[in-house]
C-alpha cells in the first residue's frame, strides 16, 4: 500500500523508467498482458463476487454479467484488433508538400493514471486498463477507497497476473490521489463526480496532461404515446434499479406526456415487483447504498425528509401523524410568541384539519408505500407529503432501512422540476416522473442545466 509523496512519486518514476525502456511497446507484450488480464477476472470470479458483495451488497449476477464478463470481453476485443490499430495508414499530403509521402501511426502516450470509482469497482478499473495496455502504455491504477475489499483484492491480484514493472496499484484515499496528481502522467482517466473531476483537471493542467473524464449527470428518458409502455417500463426499471441505481448512465428521471404518464408509472411499479418481488429488501438481486453519507443524502431527496422506521405499522397513519405533529408544533410556537401560552390553540387545530388527506393528494396516495417518522421538525415541514412537497407522490417504494443502508426501488409521480431531487444527480434507486407536454421544451430545459 503506497502512501505519502515519496511512495507515489517513486511509483511514477519506476513506471516511467519501464516505459522509456521500450518494454511495453512490442505487440507480443501487449497481447500477453491482455491475456493475463482476461485470466485475472475469469480465474478469480468468486473472489470478486465476494468483494463486491461486501462493498456494495451487489448481487453475484450483476458482478459477473456487468463487470467481470465485460472486462474479459474488452480484453479480447482489443487484443483481436491490435494489428489493425497499430498498422501504418497512408495519409494524403498537401500538394505543396509533394512529392512527400505521409502516414499515421498510433503511438503509446507513456504512463497512464486510472482513477476508478466504487460503483463498478472491477469494470471501471480494469476496462480502462485493458485499453491503456493495448496501446502500449505503463499503467498506475488508483482504485476507490470506498470499495475497500475490491481495492485490496485488485492490489493483491494485479501483480500476480500482470507485469509488475509496468502496472502498479496504489491504494489509499484522497491524500494518495492528491499526491499522484502531482506527478506528470502522460494521460489521466478519471471516472466519478464533477467535483473531483474539476480537481483532476486543475492538477492535470499543471503538466498539460490530457484527461478523459467519465462523469455522471441527469440523463432523462422521454416517453410518449408512440412507445410500447410495457417494454419501456421494463427497460427503464432495469436500467434505473440495477446496482441500486448507482450507475452513471442509469435513467435519472423520466419525462412522460400526460396521456401515458400515469400508466407508465404503474407499469414501472409492476416491473419492479417482477424483478425484485413484493419485498425488494429480501431479494438477492437488489443491492444496497455504498455508505452512510450517500444513504442520508438520498433519504433527503424522498418526499418524506426524515428516515422512517424499517417496519412501519401503517404508512398512512404515520404520514398523517407526522403532519399533525409538525402542524401542532408550529401552532404551539405561534401561540407562544403571540399570547405567551404554550397550548396549540385554535390555529393548530385548524392546521391539522387543513392537513387531512384529500383525493388525489400525496396524503391520499400514502398507501402506495410512503413512510415517515412521527417526529418532524418545523424546518422539515416542507418535506412531508402534501405540505409544500415538490417531489410528487410515491407510487411504490419509499421504505428505507438505515442499518442495511437499504432504500427500496422508489417511483415518484408528478415531480416538480424545482424539487430537490431534480437539482442533483440522484445516483440511487429513486425515479421521478415528470409530466410534460412535449420533448422539445424539455430538451431546451435540460440543455440549460449546469454541467455538474
Briefly describe each language-model feature range.
Residues 446-452:
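Conserved small/polar residues in nucleotide/adenosyl-binding loops
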Amino acid at each position: 500500500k503506497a502512501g505519502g509523496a515519496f511512495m507515489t512519486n517513486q511509483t511514477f518514476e519506476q513506471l516511467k523508467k519501464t516505459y522509456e525502456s521500450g518494454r511495453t511497446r512490442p505487440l507480443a507484450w501487449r497481447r500477453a498482458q491482455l491475456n493475463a488480464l482476461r485470466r485475472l477476472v475469469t480465474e478469480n470470479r468468486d473472489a470478486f463476487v465476494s468483494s463486491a458483495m461486501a462493498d456494495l451488497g451487489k448481487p453475484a449476477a450483476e458482478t459477473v454479467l456487468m463487470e467481470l464478463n465485460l472486462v474479459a470481453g474488452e480484453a479480447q476485443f482489443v487484443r483481436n484488433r491490435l494489428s489493425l490499430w497499430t498498422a501504418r495508414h497512408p495519409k494524403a499530403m498537401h500538394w505543396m508538400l509533394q512529392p512527400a509521402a505521409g502516414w499515421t501511426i498510433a503511438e503509446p502516450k507513456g504512463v497512464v493514471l486510472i482513477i476508478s470509482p466504487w460503483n463498478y469497482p472491477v469494470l471501471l478499473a480494469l476496462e480502462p486498463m485493458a485499453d491503456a495496455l493495448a496501446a502500449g502504455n505503463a499503467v498506475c491504477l488508483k482504485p476507490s477507497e470506498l470499495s475497500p475489499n475490491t481495492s485490496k483484492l485488485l492490489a493483491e491480484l494485479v501483480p500476480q497476473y500482470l507485469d509488475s514493472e509496468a502496472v502498479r496499484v496504489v491504494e489509499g484515499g484522497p491524500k494518495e490521489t492528491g499526491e499522484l496528481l502531482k506527478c506528470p502522467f502522460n494521460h489521466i482517466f478519471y471516472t466519478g463526480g464533477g467535483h473531483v473531476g474539476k480537481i483532476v483537471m486543475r492538477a492535470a493542467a499543471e503538466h498539460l496532461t490530457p484527461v478523459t473524464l467519465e462523469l455522471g449527470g441527469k440523463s432523462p428518458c422521454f416517453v410518449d404515446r408512440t412507445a410500447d409502455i410495457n417494454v419501456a417500463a421494463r427497460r427503464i426499471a432495469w436500467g434505473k434499479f440495477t446496482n441500486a441505481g448507482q450507475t452513471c448512465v442509469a435513467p435519472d428521471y423520466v419525462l412522460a406526456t400526460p396521456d401515458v404518464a400515469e400508466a407508465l408509472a404503474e407499469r414501472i411499479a409492476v416491473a419492479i415487483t417482477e424483478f425484485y418481488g413484493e419485498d425488494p429488501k429480501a431479494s438477492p438481486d437488489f443491492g444496497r447504498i455504498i455508505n452512510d453519507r450517500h444513504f442520508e443524502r438520498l433519504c433527503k431527496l424522498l418526499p418524506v425528509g426524515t428516515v422512517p422506521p424499517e417496519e412501519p405499522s401503517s404508512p398512512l397513519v404515520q404520514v398523517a401523524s407526522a403532519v399533525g405533529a409538525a402542524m401542532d408544533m408550529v401552532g404551539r410556537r405561534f401561540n407562544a410568541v403571540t399570547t405567551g401560552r404554550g397550548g396549540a390553540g385554535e390555529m393548530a387545530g385548524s392546521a391539522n384539519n387543513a392537513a387531512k388527506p384529500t383525493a388525489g393528494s400525496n396524503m391520499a396516495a400514502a398507501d402506495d408505500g410512503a413512510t415517515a417518522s412521527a417526529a418532524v421538525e418545523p424546518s422539515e415541514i416542507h418535506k412531508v407529503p402534501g405540505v409544500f412537497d415538490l417531489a410528487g407522490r410515491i407510487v411504490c417504494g419509499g421504505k428505507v432501512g438505515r442499518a442495511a443502508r437499504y432504500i427500496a426501488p422508489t417511483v415518484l409521480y408528478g415531480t416538480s422540476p424545482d424539487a430537490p431531487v431534480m437539482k442533483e444527480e440522484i445516483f440511487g434507486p429513486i425515479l421521478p416522473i415528470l409530466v410534460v407536454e412535449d420533448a422539445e421544451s424539455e430538451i431546451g430545459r435540460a440543455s440549460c442545466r449546469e454541467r455538474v
